[in-house]
Amino acid sequence: MNCLIAIALSVSFFLVGIVGPIQAQLQMNFYANSCPNAEKIVQDFVSNHVSNAPSLAAALIRMHFHDCFVRGCDGSVLINSTSGNAERDATPNLTVRGFGFIDAIKSVLEAQCPGIVSCADIIALASRDAVVFTGGPNWSVPTGRRDGRISNAAEALANIPPPTSNITNLQTLFANQGLDLKDLVLLSGAHTIGVSHCSSFTNRLYNFTGRGGQDPALDSEYAANLKSRKCPSLNDNKTIVEMDPGSRKTFDLSYYQLVLKRRGLFQSDSALTTNPTTLSNINRILTGSVGSFFSEFAKSMEKMGRINVKTGSAGVVRRQCSVANS
């Protein structure tokens, strides 16, 4: 009898161990009872502003990406630091935009449901909604993320793929987050609505080898155009260039066509053609429909949105997205 009781207790504790994490997972409509209008508030706010800010979708999806790649999707990219060592102070995040936009959404939500909706969930929802309102793909965003307490510039520098990445570096950094080469190609497709400062790629135009010279992987005609019309010097850090010229406002397949023509703006774009798996994925996407691409892109976004999420007591809900709870 004692043996049976011991076994029963063991099973009971085992089940508690299983049920706990399951209950802590993300779920659709997480705020249905605690803040029923949360997702509509985010959606309406995005809808009211995206028409006046066509680059908003690209800015928010980039913020979501940069947030998830450092300590998971926990809103830590939003935290300000008086000492200048938070994630947003790291070089990859100096050109990230949308912080004020997320703060504004948070203020509306706090007025409706104080201390309920996390900043991490706001980023995930707003980035999806902004892309949808520009005619891009839709994807499921389960909620229940908690916000992180730590934001470290060095970690951002170590984990966010720079635009100078080769395929080996990209594969490693994506694998570190549980993403594969297919995800890399699909998520890179967001560059179709992206923009970049000249400083992110002028080394390809003026000093690729460190002793001057141009990146041979970049189409020479395209490079000449960039030099003469967009980025006249190596040190231009103000001019903004479309990553998918002429099609930036349309979420489509043209980015991949440019990559195959050696007209991807970043080295990391060109790198996608240097690996048989990534190249095969590009060709497969281009022979398929836009609808198929949207469906696959959605799956990779859903996968990215679950990276190392904090739920339950593992995180907090910040009252101000830019300030870590004391």
Swiss-Prot record:
GO molecular function, a single term: lactoperoxidase activity
Record's subcellular location: Secreted
Residues noted as binding heme b in the record, renumbered to the chain: H191
Site (Transition state stabilizer): R62
CDD domains hit by this protein: secretory_peroxidase
Reactions the enzyme catalyzes: 2 a phenolic donor + H2O2 = 2 a phenolic radical donor + 2 H2O
Binding site for substrate: P161
Signal peptide: 1-24
Active site as annotated: H66 (proton acceptor)
Glycan attachment points: N80, N138, N166, N207, N237
Pfam assignment, any one: peroxidase
Residues engaged in binding Ca(2+) 1: D67, V70, G72, D74, S76
Superkingdom, natural source: Eukaryota
Keywords from the named record: Calcium, Disulfide bond, Glycoprotein, Heme, Hydrogen peroxide, Iron, Metal-binding, Oxidoreductase, Peroxidase, Secreted, Signal
Binding-site residues for Ca(2+) 2, renumbered to this chain: T192, D244, S247, D252
Known cofactor(s): heme b; Ca(2+)
Induction line: Up-regulated by cold temperatures and down-regulated by light. In response to low temperatures, transcripts accumulate in the whole etiolated seedlings but only in roots of light-grown seedlings.
GO process terms (BP): hydrogen peroxide catabolic process; hyperosmotic salinity response; response to cold; response to desiccation; response to oxidative stress
Any single GO CC term annotated in Swiss-Prot or TrEMBL for this entry: extracellular region
EC nos: 1.11.1.7
EC supergroup of this enzyme: oxidoreductase
Cofactor: how and how many bound: Binds 1 heme b (iron(II)-protoporphyrin IX) group per subunit. Binds 2 calcium ions per subunit.
Disulphide linkage map: C35-C113, C68-C73, C119-C321, C198-C231
UniProt record similarity statement: Belongs to the peroxidase family. Classical plant (class III) peroxidase subfamily.
Function in brief: Removal of H(2)O(2), oxidation of toxic reductants, biosynthesis and degradation of lignin, suberization, auxin catabolism, response to environmental stresses such as wounding, pathogen attack and oxidative stress. These functions might be dependent on each isozyme/isoform in each plant tissue.
Name the record gives this protein: Peroxidase 3
Natural source organism: Arabidopsis thaliana
Upper lineage: Eukaryota, Viridiplantae, Streptophyta, Embryophyta, Tracheophyta
Name of the gene this protein is made from: PER3
